[in-house]
Regions:
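N-terminal nucleophile
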Residues: 1-246
Length: 246
């Protein structure tokens, strides 16, 4: 049940600042942030079960990330993680890449995909007929469409807009928020009350399922910096990786 918030300001010294939490079962094998040996352009964490990624960067200040959509899974879907790695490993413009995905989106379980570079940032909701080029601004995304007003998403977007964007620790602290709304404020997405309640905070501290990583992405004038902090069961810190890609 991943969540992310970002500020997109093309034409400035920092076109993109993004924070993301990846939520997943702790038993699912994962490799930490690194350059991939089989796809050297890709710099990302890796889902070792399906082989894809949830967030990564590539040379040329290319960037992609995704979240799942809460809906019934397909019986035998393609891995959504390949949507990130295929973009990063290629040379297509982000809008062109997302446009071509529209025709095959039904082969994947529900997803939201962001793909961009220094000039353009595009968004595709799996059920949309066309991708959307994003205008400058602050956005938040979870497991429904962009800026769907779930309580934790509204809270995170507001806090992000009020935080010093140069203070990494303050930014990471936003993603450690364990606040939960009252039961009456919970969305109804078909996953049942227990799951709605468990996943209603920005940070999920579960022993079986929870936040596995927090990522901070900065796009600068000539490079991208990606920092990833990993967590074990119960939200216990499990390491940090950082890299810069020109």
């Amino acid at each position: 049940m991943c969540i992310l918030v970002f500020d997109w300001q093309p034409g400035t010294r920092q076109p993109l600042l993004l924070l993301a939490n990846r939520d997943e079962f702790h038993a699912r094998p994962t490799a930490a942030l690194a350059q991939w040996t089989d796809l050297p352009l890709v710099h990302a964490g890796r889902d070792l079960q399906a082989g894809g990624s949830w967030l990564g960067v590539a040379p040329g200040r290319r960037f992609a990330t995704l979240t799942n959509i809460r809906e019934p899974e397909l019986a035998r879907p393609r891995s959504r993680g390949e949507l990130v790695s295929q973009y990063l490993a290629g040379q297509q413009l982000p809008g062109q890449y997302l446009q071509e995905l529209v025709a095959i989106a039904g082969e994947y379980s529900g997803f939201n995909l962001l793909a961009g570079d220094t000039d353009e940032l595009w968004f595709l909701h799996a059920k949309a007929e066309q991708p959307q080029q994003l205008a400058p601004g602050i956005y938040a995304l979870c497991n429904a469409n962009l800026d769907t007003p779930w309580p934790k998403l509204v809270r995170l977007r507001t806090a992000f807009s009020q935080t010093d964007q140069h203070d990494d620790e303050a930014l990471f602290a936003l993603m450690q928020d364990s606040w939960r709304p009252s039961d009456g404020m919970l969305p109804e997405t078909g996953v049942g009350f227990a799951v709605e309640r468990q996943s209603s905070s920005v940070l999920i501290r579960g022993e079986q399922y929870g936040t596995r990583a927090t990522s901070l992405v900065r796009m600068g004038a000539d490079s991208m910096q990606l920092t990833e902090r990993s967590f074990a069961a119960g939200g216990r810190p499990a390491g940090e990786c950082s890299l810069v890609v020109a």
